[in-house]
């Protein structure tokens, strides 16, 4: 269930935490409730939980207008987006054209902007939209070519599957702090936040909307005041450990890509009273090895 549900490839995506999130929902009697992501990005984890029946609704928010435009196109312009996926040529010439559209950032044409974002995500190295080169290089002399991650029918299928859940997917385009403050009193008691801010280190190289130290502190101040249970995931750096020092912190072994075996360590921070699996609390959690017990 946790694999390949999102049409986007996203750096630092947390789909690999699907089993962990499902267990947290179950152990805290939050199943079939609402699930909230202030930083939607690729939405892989949120969609996996929705498709798996672990939550009834997901609230996804992203400040980046290009990312928001893509998700808005899935929910509100499904067939038009599917036709673009099926018919647009995947060539270097088209890559240049789509990059110009994305860089223009015309939010008055969300389908055009959303598709450009999607096109670059599927054709750029590692799915990095900002400042990344095209797969295979402009000369296309690399081992992999521009279209190697652009399986039209599979991607169209994913888009149509998501659209079937449109009435249970709530999309916003707000600053994450503003979003959390506005939604916290509106969601039901059985709700869980999964908060995955831009990395503290190297965030500027991965995200359009990256944070400086003050912004990270602003986020933590808001998170610590939330009424509902939450988990926060971050790169494991001392600065983040310091600003969340009043909450429990655990190191997680994370698989950064489904296709590779590269594993790194990230920090998980949990709200007061949230029950966590012993693999997390005892420091033995490895995402690739963790499963949902019956």
Write out the residue ranges for each language-model feature.
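Class I S-adenosyl-L-methionine
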Residues: 1-54, 174-192, 199-294
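A structural signal for isolated positions on well-ordered beta-strands in alpha/beta enzyme cores
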Residues: 59, 170, 229-231
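Conserved S-adenosyl-L-methionine
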Residues: 31-93
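A short helix-to-beta-strand connector/capping loop
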Residues: 54-56, 164-169, 245
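Non-catalytic surface loops within mature trypsin-like serine protease
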Residues: 65, 122, 271-273
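SAM-dependent nucleic-acid methyltransferase catalytic core
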Residues: 2-23, 30, 74-194, 198-204, ...
């Amino acid at each position: 269930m946790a694999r390949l549900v999102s049409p986007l490839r996203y750096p630092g995506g947390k789909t690999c935490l699907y089993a962990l999130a499902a267990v947290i929902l179950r152990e805290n009697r939050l199943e079939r409730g609402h699930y909230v992501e202030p930083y939607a990005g690729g939405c892989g984890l949120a969609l996996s939980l929705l498709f798996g029946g672990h939550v009834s609704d997901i609230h996804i928010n992203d400040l980046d207008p290009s990312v928001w435009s893509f998700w808005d196109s899935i929910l509100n312009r499904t067939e038009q987006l599917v036709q673009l996926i099926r018919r647009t040529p995947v060539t270097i010439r088209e890559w240049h054209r789509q990059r110009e559209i994305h860089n223009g950032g015309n939010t008055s044409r969300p389908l055009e902007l959303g598709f450009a974002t999607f096109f670059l995500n599927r054709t750029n190295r590692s799915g990095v939209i900002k400042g990344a080169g095209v797969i295979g290089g402009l000369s296309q002399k690399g081992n992999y070519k521009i279209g190697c991650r652009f399986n039209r029918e599979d991607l169209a299928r994913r888009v149509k599957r998501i659209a079937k859940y449109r009435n249970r997917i709530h999309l916003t385009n707000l600053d994450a702090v503003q979003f959390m403050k506005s939604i916290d009193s509106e969601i039901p008691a059985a709700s869980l936040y999964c908060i995955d801010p831009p990395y503290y280190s190297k965030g500027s190289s991965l995200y359009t909307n990256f944070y400086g130290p003050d912004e990270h502190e602003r986020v933590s101040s808001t998170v610590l005041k939330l009424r509902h249970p939450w988990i926060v995931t971050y790169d494991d750096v001392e600065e983040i450990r310091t600003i969340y020092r009043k909450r429990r912190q655990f190191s997680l072994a994370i698989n950064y890509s489904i296709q590779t075996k590269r594993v790194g360590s990230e920090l998980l921070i949990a709200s007061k009273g949230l029950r966590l699996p012993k693999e997390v609390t005892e420091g033995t959690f490895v995402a690739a090895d963790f499963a949902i017990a019956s």
